[in-house]
């Protein structure tokens, strides 16, 4: 590819296996040493020659180390307040029914669980609380924080037009007739009629973002031990990242939306495996201080990239076959050779105090 050259030969950097034997001495499955058989190392293409082993018509697989320059940064687009409806009877796939111990969110790299509502009725959809708005000035931003001028209540909004659905951030509730103001947009309006939502059962679940040591898996909710199963349909609301094209994620991959992804909001990853002989890091990785080469699995059937569309998962999420990397939402990255060196430029702020005389 562009800005890629093959490294000089060493046995640990080149692995060639025979997939289909030709008329040479090599058999299917053989691993072939390439010492003295490579021409073109240091360039963008190489030629491997061994007529004795390969003969004619052999098919082989080569895994090689390359040097890549001018690496392209991948972006993570912040998506706020995505809604997922979980109903019974739609599919037999595990993770798609309210009573399943594990609920699939249908996509990877979810960074925040906002709320889970239970309708308490098998034939009724769960809903978030909402209010009508009058005298609106400006346009609210999806996912932003709003504050009530009279009550002091704060919440994050789901939709931006009346009636506005919201998730309270405090134990204080809004009151009719008060003015609300958006923190990010500066939009304002007057609350009219308030409508209660379904029962909030967020505390019944543990949240799994789907991050793994070497890839981004499907995010999920795991019902806590001794928590009762829901009696109705569920509405799950969460924030997630959409992955762009490129080679790796850095601190600059994260873009703020509605004051919900500032520098301090960039997630931390807790490793599933920790080397006890390594003093640092101790299994905690601040992604704002990390080169992240992990690939992301594709979205599960029933998801939509349109943020305002309510998802309803219909496919299998947790079996090995469902971890595909070539469909909608998937993101592939070439991984680095262990122990290799990464060279990059960085900018940082150096504080200084000085006296003016």
Language model: regions and residue ranges:
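Subunit-assembly interface segments of extracellular/virion macromolecular structures
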Residues: 1-357
């Amino acid at each position: 590819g562009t800005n890629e050259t093959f490294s000089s030969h060493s046995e640990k950097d080149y692995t060639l296996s025979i997939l289909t034997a030709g008329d040479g001495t090599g058999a299917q499955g053989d691993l072939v040493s390439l010492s003295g058989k490579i021409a073109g190392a240091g360039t963008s293409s190489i030629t491997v020659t061994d007529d004795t082993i390969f003969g004619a018509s052999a098919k082989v697989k080569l895994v090689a180390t390359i040097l890549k320059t001018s690496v392209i940064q991948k972006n993570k687009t912040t998506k706020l307040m995505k809604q997922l409806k979980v109903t019974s009877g739609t599919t037999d796939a595990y993770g798609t029914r309210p009573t399943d111990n594990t609920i699939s969110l249908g996509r990877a790299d979810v960074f925040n669980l906002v709320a889970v509502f239970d309708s308490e009725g098998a034939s009724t959809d769960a809903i978030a609380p909402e209010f009508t708005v009058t005298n609106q000035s400006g346009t609210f931003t999806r996912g932003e924080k709003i504050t009530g001028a009279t009550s002091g209540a704060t919440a994050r909004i789901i939709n931006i037009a009346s009636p506005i659905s919201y998730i309270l951030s405090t134990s204080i509730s809004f009151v009719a007739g008060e003015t609300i103001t958006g923190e990010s947009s500066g939009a304002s309006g007057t609350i009219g009629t308030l409508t209660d939502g379904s029962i909030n059962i967020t505390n019944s679940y543990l949240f799994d973002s789907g991050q793994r040591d070497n890839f981004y898996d499907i995010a999920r909710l795991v019902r806590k031990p001794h928590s009762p199963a829901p009696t109705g349909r569920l509405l799950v609301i969460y924030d997630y990242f959409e992955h762009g094209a490129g080679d790796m994620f850095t601190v600059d991959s994260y873009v703020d939306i509605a004051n919900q992804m500032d520098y301090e909001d960039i997630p931390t990853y807790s490793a599933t495996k920790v080397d006890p002989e390594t003093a640092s890091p101790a299994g905690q990785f601040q992604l704002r201080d990390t080169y992240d080469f992990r690939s992301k699995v594709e979205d599960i059937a029933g998801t939509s990239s349109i943020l305002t569309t309510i998802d309803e998962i219909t496919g299998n999420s947790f079996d090995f076959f469902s971890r595909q990397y070539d469909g909608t939402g998937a993101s592939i990255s070439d991984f680095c050779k262990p122990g290799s060196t990464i060279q990059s430029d960085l900018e940082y702020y150096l504080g200084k105090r000085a006296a003016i005389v």
